[in-house]
C-alpha cells in the first residue's frame, strides 16, 4: 500500500482540495473562518493534540515590572481565557486551567491529569485591578508598558494577542500593551535570549505523562524562558521523577503541587488547550491519530473500496 502526502501551504486550499476529492483528509482548525464553515460536516473527526498555549513572563530582571508578583497575578486575573477561545480562536480549543492539557494522561481512577492538577485560573477584573494598583505602588510607578511577542505566521496568534491587549488595557488602568509579531524562528530565538517582555508560546507533549510538561519550568530548564526559580516547584517535580516515579497517583500529587507553585506566584499564564479537527474521507479505515508522539499512524490504515 502507498500513502501520498501533499504539503499544501494555504489551509483553505487544502479544504477545497478535500471537497474536490483530491485529498482524503484536511485540517479545519487553522482559522476561525474555516472551522466555522466546516465544523458541522459529517466528515469531521477529532485530531487529538496534547498542546497548551501560554504566556511566558520575563522574570530575569530585565523587565522590572514583571519581577513583581502582584503585577503578574494581576495580568493572570485580567486574562479572560473563555473570551479568548470564543472570540479569537474558535477552532475547537478550550480554556486552559493548568499547564498540562486534557487528554495527555489518564490516572488509574479514570481522572484526567489536567483536571486533577488544575488551579483556579479565573477572570476577575476587580481583583486584577486591585493587585495591579498595589504592584505599581511597590514598584514606585504610575504606569507601565509591556510588549507581547507572538508568531507573525499564525492567524490565531494575532487574534489572541489583540484580545489580550484589549482586555488587559480595559481592566488594568496604567497599563499600555504593545504588540510585536515575528517569525516562528525569531520568536524561539527571542525566547531563548530573554529578548521579550511577555511571549506567547505553545508546547506539545512528547509522551503521555506529566513530566513532558512540568519539566519545562525547572530552574535549570532551557525552556524556562522567563528564567524564574521556584524551589517548591523544583522539589515537587524532582519528587515525581525520583521518589514517586513508580507510583502514578503520588506523581500526580507532585504535579499538582508544582502547578500550585506556578499558580500562586503567577510564573506563567495558561491560555488554552489547542484542539484540532479535520475532515476525513469516510472510506479511510484504521487511521490512528495520537495526541503525543507519532500523531498520525498509517500502520493499519486502508481505504475501503
Task: Give names to the regions the model predicted.
Residues 2, 51-98, 144-155, 245-264:
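Alpha-helical secondary-structure segments
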Residues 4-63, 86-87:
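Extracellular/periplasmic solute-recognition and catalytic clefts
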Residues 12-23, 36-40, 69-70, 162-170, ...:
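Short helices/loops that flank or line small-molecule/ion binding pockets
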Residues 35-48, 195, 209-224, 281-285:
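Ligand-binding "clamshell"
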Residues 85, 174-187, 214-281, 305:
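Extracytoplasmic/peripheral linker and loop segments enriched in polar/acidic and small residues
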Residues 95-134, 155-157, 246:
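Structural transition elements
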Residues 133-205, 276:
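Ligand/substrate-recognition segments at binding pockets and active sites
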Residues 278-305:
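Long beta-strand-rich cores associated with HINT superfamily self-processing modules
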Amino acid at each position: 500500500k502507498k500513502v501520498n502526502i501533499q504539503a499544501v501551504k494555504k489551509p483553505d486550499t487544502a479544504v477545497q482540495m478535500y471537497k474536490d476529492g483530491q485529498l482524503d483528509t484536511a485540517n479545519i482548525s487553522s482559522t476561525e473562518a474555516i472551522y466555522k464553515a466546516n465544523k458541522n460536516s459529517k466528515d469531521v473527526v477529532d485530531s487529538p493534540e496534547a498542546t497548551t498555549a501560554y504566556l511566558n513572563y520575563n522574570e530575569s530582571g530585565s523587565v522590572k515590572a514583571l519581577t513583581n508578583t502582584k503585577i503578574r497575578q494581576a495580568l493572570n486575573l485580567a486574562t479572560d481565557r473563555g473570551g479568548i477561545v470564543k472570540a479569537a480562536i474558535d477552532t475547537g480549543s478550550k480554556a486552559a486551567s493548568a499547564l498540562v492539557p486534557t487528554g495527555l494522561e489518564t490516572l488509574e481512577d479514570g481522572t484526567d491529569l489536567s483536571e486533577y492538577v488544575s488551579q483556579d485560573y479565573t477572570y476577575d477584573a476587580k481583583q486584577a485591578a486591585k493587585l495591579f494598583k498595589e504592584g505599581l505602588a511597590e514598584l514606585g510607578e504610575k504606569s507601565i508598558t509591556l510588549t507581547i511577542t507572538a508568531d507573525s505566521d499564525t492567524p490565531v496568534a494575532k487574534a489572541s494577542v489583540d484580545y489580550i491587549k484589549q482586555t488587559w488595557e480595559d481592566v488594568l488602568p496604567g497599563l499600555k500593551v504593545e504588540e510585536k509579531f515575528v517569525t516562528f524562528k525569531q520568536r524561539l530565538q527571542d525566547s531563548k535570549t530573554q529578548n521579550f517582555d511577555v511571549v506567547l508560546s505553545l508546547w506539545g507533549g512528547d509522551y503521555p505523562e506529566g513530566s513532558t510538561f512540568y519539566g519545562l519550568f525547572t530552574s535549570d530548564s532551557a525552556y524556562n524562558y522567563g528564567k524564574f526559580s521556584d524551589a517548591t516547584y523544583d522539589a515537587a517535580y524532582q519528587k515525581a521523577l525520583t521518589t514517586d516515579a513508580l507510583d502514578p497517583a503520588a506523581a500526580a500529587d507532585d504535579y499538582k503541587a508544582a502547578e500550585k507553585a506556578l499558580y500562586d506566584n503567577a510564573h506563567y499564564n495558561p491560555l488554552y488547550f489547542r484542539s484540532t479537527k479535520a475532515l476525513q474521507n469516510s472510506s479511510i479505515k484504521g487511521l490512528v491519530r495520537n495526541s503525543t508522539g507519532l500523531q498520525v499512524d498509517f500502520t493499519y490504515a486502508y481505504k475501503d473500496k
